[in-house]
């Protein structure tokens, strides 16, 4: 009798997975997908990265003025220019092609994060890609998904302060709200990694800004304040 539960366990797990995956797919189809139209697909990508990258390519300022009327128009750039510079090559393509490549990069980021954490169960990958945050992130083209593999690397390399510190610095320079990673390093007494993370953040912020002549560096804090109002 003890063998029967053992034989049924894989079947039970399979049923749970199918039910969970189906539920998440239905939620994505009926909750997230209807929210997107032709004007909203890639909305975050276009406003925060694509349009600023085009401006950089043409030698124009990538940031709007730090006034409410400018911030309320579309979805303007608010973060340091590191990711904008990385997107510049994509702007040589059409918008549709650039967005398609960006979406593939986002999917690769989610899959890569699980691979970095040595997740081998294919069901975890399916669940992750069907989750509402990921589906919404893909729909908006939000760069936050790119922070997922960086956070995974920070965890995997947590005992290697040079690599861990650099990765945390790169994550924060990409999107400033990743700064709690430094708090985590300090809380776990990884002081050298935390110090390097601070230095790396400064380097990854200042160097890209230097490439665009520090355009918008003094107004960006004002942009962040205005956007929160």
Regions found by a protein language model. Give the residues of each.
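Membrane-interface alpha helices of multi-pass inner-membrane proteins
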Residues: 162-186
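Primarily membrane-embedded glycan-assembly and transfer machineries that use lipid-linked glycans
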Residues: 1-164, 188-229
